[in-house]
Amino acid sequence: MKVEIYSIPNCTYCSKAKFLAEHSGKVHEVEYKMMGAHYSAADVRELFPTARTFPQIVVDDKPIGGYTELERLLNG
């Protein structure tokens, strides 16, 4: 499975999501994207119109939500 993590600086749950994805044994590719370096606020509004928190996570090209949803998917 491929996981894309859209993050912001100093985001604890963004870092936790990256660690979880990298160490789960279920993910073959992790892309960690930082706002400002890899995408803009406008991109977030377009990709995740209802999002209000970070990280925003995409699994195999499908937005799933945030850290809690990733944890549920990988550990459930």
Tell where the protein language model's regions lie, with residue ranges:
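Local sequence-structure signature of Cys/Sec-based thiol-disulfide redox active-site neighborhoods
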Residues: M1-H28
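A general structural signal for well-ordered alpha-helical segments in protein cores
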Residues: A41, A51, Y67-L70
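Thiol/disulfide oxidoreductase modules built on the thioredoxin-like
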Residues: E46-T53
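Thiol-based oxidoreductase modules, predominantly thioredoxin-like and allied folds used
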Residues: S7, V27-A41
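Non-catalytic, surface beta->alpha helical segment in thiol-disulfide oxidoreductase systems
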Residues: V59-G76
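Short alpha-helical
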Residues: T12, Y39, G65
